Regions:
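Solvent-exposed coil/turn segments that connect beta secondary-structure elements
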Residues: 56, 67-69, 114-118, 144, ...
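Surface-exposed amphipathic alpha-helical segments
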Residues: 37, 143-176
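Boundary at the C-terminal end of the N-terminal hydrophobic targeting segment
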Residues: 16-21
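A short, polar/proline- and glycine-enriched secondary-structure boundary/capping micro-motif
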Residues: 73-75, 121-122, 159-163
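Charge-biased low-complexity segments
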Residues: 40, 56, 124-132, 175
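Secretory pathway targeting signatures of secreted, lumenal, and periplasmic proteins
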Residues: 27-89, 99
Length: 176
C-alpha cells in the first residue's frame, strides 16, 4: 500500500511539473522545459542549452550539446566514451542500457548509465568519481546534425527527472 501511494505521489508530482512547462528554443526546435528546470547561460560553445534542476533526492543538471553537422562523433563512439566514465558497484566499467525510438520523425537513441561517475569530456573517468550517479542521454538525429540531450546527477534525482526529460524530447517541435 505504501509503495502504491508513493508511486501515485510521484506520478502526481511529475504531472504537476509537466503541466506548466516553459518554451526554450534550441536551434530550430522549441522544447517544453519543466518549470523546475532553471535555464543557465551555457558554460561552453558546445552547449546550446543548459539547466540546473531542483529535485527531491539530490541535485541534477541537464544540457543540450550541438557540434554541427557531421561533428561530435557517432552514437556508438559517444556511448563508449560515456560508459568509460562509469564504474559499477564491483569497480568494473558500467554497461549502458540502450533504447531506440523516434521523435517528430527523427531517430532517437536513449543511453542510460548508473554507478560511480566521474564526468568529463574525454575517455575514462575525469577526477574523483561520485557514487550513486546517473546519466541519461537522448541522441536526436536531426537534419542539422545530432543533438545530445544529457541529464545527469544523483540517482534519486534522475529517477524523478527522467520522465520529464522524455516528455521534453517527445514534445519538441520545429519552428515557432
Amino acid at each position: 500500500m505504501k509503495t502504491t501511494l508513493a508511486a501515485l505521489a510521484l506520478a502526481i508530482a511529475t504531472a504537476a511539473h509537466a503541466a506548466s512547462p516553459m518554451a526554450v528554443r534550441v536551434l530550430d526546435w522549441m522544447l517544453p522545459v519543466p518549470a523546475n528546470w532553471t535555464p543557465q547561460v551555457p558554460s561552453s560553445d558546445m552547449r546550446v542549452a543548459q539547466f540546473t534542476i531542483k529535485s527531491e533526492g539530490g541535485s541534477a543538471d541537464a544540457a543540450v550539446f550541438y557540434f554541427g553537422q557531421g561533428s561530435g562523433g557517432s552514437v556508438e563512439e559517444n556511448t563508449q566514451r560515456w560508459a568509460s566514465q562509469f564504474l559499477d558497484d564491483a569497480g568494473k566499467p558500467a554497461k549502458p542500457r540502450i533504447e531506440k525510438g523516434t521523435t517528430g520523425g527523427m531517430p532517437v537513441t536513449w543511453v542510460s548509465l548508473d554507478g560511480r561517475y566521474a564526468r568529463g569530456m574525454g575517455t575514462g573517468p575525469q577526477g574523483e568519481a561520485k557514487a550513486k550517479q546517473s546519466l541519461r542521454v537522448a541522441v536526436i538525429e536531426t537534419d542539422r546534425g545530432n543533438l545530445f540531450f544529457q541529464l545527469w546527477g544523483d540517482e534519486a534525482a534522475i529517477a524523478r527527472q527522467f520522465p520529464l526529460m522524455k516528455m521534453v524530447v517527445s514534445q519538441m517541435k520545429r519552428g515557432a
